[in-house]
Design a protein with these regions (language model features):
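Catalytic core of pol beta-like nucleotidyltransferases
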Residues: 1-42, 49-153
Length: 153
């Protein structure tokens, strides 16, 4: 994965229920990890930390926004403000070379993970600018979950 994405292996991490067995997402209420054979299987969530990739992707979206409307603009800008970017397989490519090249790499990697490692879960990822942004995002989610637990007692 590290070689395919050109990101140091220390800057790639599995998170979420695939790592902890339970989801810490406030909206999922500690749901347990479900394998691909189970009904409604869980996703595999991956953190990618690369300031260069974050900056290049942000630049690509700025260039795109100068030419046309970006789908889910408010979500994208909210993510960038929090120093991460999510790109889904189904997202518009906008005829931007950086976005198209990145999605080609990711699609190839996902196919390899399925054939080589028999990982058939949907794979989601976020590109973070740095580890501080990862920490801040996940601490806020855990705090929300903690407050929900306290409120229901």
């Amino acid at each position: 994965m590290s070689k395919n994405l050109n990101i140091h292996f220390h800057n790639i991490s599995i998170i979420g229920s695939a790592k902890t067995r339970f989801s810490f997402s406030p909206s999922k209420n500690f749901s347990e990890f479900r394998d691909y054979n189970d009904e409604n299987p869980s996703d595999l969530d991956i953190v990618l930390v690369s300031q260069t990739l974050f900056d290049d992707t942000w630049t690509a979206f700025r260039e795109i926004s100068n030419q046309k409307h970006i789908c889910n603009y408010s979500q994208k800008t909210s993510e960038i403000f929090r120093q991460f970017i999510s790109i889904k397989d189904s997202d518009e490519r906008y005829e931007n070379e950086h976005i198209k090249d990145w999605l080609k790499k990711v699609m190839s990697l996902k196919a390899e993970m399925q054939t080589r490692f028999q990982i058939y879960l949907d794979i989601n990822y976020r590109i973070y600018k740095n580890w501080e942004a990862v920490e801040e995002y996940h601490i806020k989610g855990i705090e929300k979950l903690k407050n929900q637990v306290i409120e229901t007692k």
